[in-house]
Amino acid sequence: MATMRRICFLFVFNLAVATSTQGISDEISPDIPETSQAVIDGHRLKGSSKVSKATTGSEERFIRSQLQFLINKIFGARGVAKVLVEEGPKSGVFNKLKEILVKISKFEMKGDMLYMVYIYTILFLSIPIILGVAMYINHHVESSYIH
């Protein structure tokens, strides 16, 4: 069970890192102000002391609750989830996960992002098959030495 949680965490973390390097910020809906786009990209505009948020308060709470639910399912510990959700906004990974959740909830994923989700889903689903084949081969190799 702990191995499955680690695999799930690595899947989500790798998805966030991969999307941050793929530049999906170009696909963000145009209704987000430029200042918010700069925050999502991890940059701060010069001369702006206050930067507007990309989402409204209710959307932010919904996204945080969805993210906390996801992390609770993966880790099964509310303490870990609370720290990750509350401290996460300081890191770029939280923004990418938030972006993914928004895109999934609005079904606006397209192009490279959708392709990445398909690839990661296929890889994620193939892990048990690969492990099963490896265990099967290992069992037969070990049993051939015994006989």
From Swiss-Prot:
GO cellular component: extracellular region; host cell membrane; membrane
Swiss-Prot/TrEMBL keywords: Host membrane, Membrane, Secreted, Signal, Transmembrane, Transmembrane helix
Membrane topology: Single-pass type I membrane protein
Record localization: Secreted; Host membrane
Taxonomic superkingdom: Eukaryota
Keyword Transmembrane helix (UniProt): yes
Residue ranges crossing the lipid bilayer per the database entry: 117-137
The keyword Transmembrane is annotated on this UniProt entry: yes
Signal sequence region: 1-23
Residues spanned by motif dEER: 58-61
Subunit structure: Interacts with host transcription factor NAC069.
Family (UniProt): Belongs to the RxLR effector family.
Physiological role: Secreted effector that inhibits stress-induced relocalization of the transcription factor NAC069 to the nucleus, thus affecting its broad role in abiotic and biotic stress responses.
Domain comment quoted from the record: Has the canonical EER motif, but lacks the canonical translocation motif RxLR, which characterizes most oomycete effectors identified so far.
Protein name: Secreted RxLR effector protein BLN04
Species lineage: Eukaryota, Sar, Stramenopiles, Oomycota, Peronosporales
